[in-house]
């Protein structure tokens, strides 16, 4: 009976050693997802803030341009409609 216990104990020890993972080399395709997530959130935040700034800057320039323009368009503008207006005002 003691022989059976020793045999079982040796077999269980061998199984435990077989199940224990040997140190493996680093897999080159294993990524640190926490760092990737943080980096992605930082880049997304920077792009979001830049987008808001661009939108606000365009809105400010459009308001500035419309406040500066009053009445008839400048004669320097080369649109067809402005050239017709200039010609029609000269005939009077």
Curated annotation (Swiss-Prot):
Region (Disordered): 67-92
Biased composition (Basic residues): 83-92
InterPro entries: FXYD_motif, Ion-transport_regulator_FXYD, PLM
Major subcellular location class: membrane
Signal peptide residue numbers: 1-20
Residue spans, topological domain Cytoplasmic: 57-92
Sequence positions bearing Phosphoserine: 82-83, 88
Subcellular location: Cell membrane, Sarcolemma; Apical cell membrane; Membrane, Caveola; Cell membrane, Sarcolemma, T-tubule
The UniProt record lists the keyword Membrane: yes
One Gene Ontology cellular component: apical plasma membrane
Entry similarity comment: Belongs to the FXYD family.
Classification via PANTHER family: PHOSPHOLEMMAN (PTHR14132:SF12), SODIUM/POTASSIUM-TRANSPORTING ATPASE SUBUNIT GAMMA (PTHR14132)
Summary of subunit composition and partner proteins: Homotetramer. Monomer. Regulatory subunit of the sodium/potassium-transporting ATPase (NKA) which is composed of a catalytic alpha subunit, a non-catalytic beta subunit and an additional regulatory subunit. The monomeric form associates with NKA while the oligomeric form does not. Interacts with the catalytic alpha-1 subunit ATP1A1. Also interacts with the catalytic alpha-2 and alpha-3 subunits ATP1A2 and ATP1A3. Very little interaction with ATP1A1, ATP1A2 or ATP1A3 when phosphorylated at Ser-83. Interacts with the non-catalytic beta-1 subunit ATP1B1.
Name of the protein: Phospholemman
Species for this entry: Oryctolagus cuniculus (Rabbit)
């Amino acid at each position: 009976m003691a022989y059976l216990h020793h045999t079982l104990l040796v077999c269980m020890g061998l199984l435990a050693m077989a199940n224990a993972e040997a140190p493996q080399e680093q897999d080159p395709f294993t990524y640190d997802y926490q760092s990737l997530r943080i980096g992605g959130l930082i880049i997304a935040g920077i792009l979001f803030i830049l987008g808001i700034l661009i939108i606000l800057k365009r809105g400010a320039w459009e308001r500035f341009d419309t406040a500066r323009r009053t009445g008839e368009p400048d004669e320097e503008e080369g649109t067809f409609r402005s050239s017709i207006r200039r010609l029609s005002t000269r005939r009077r």
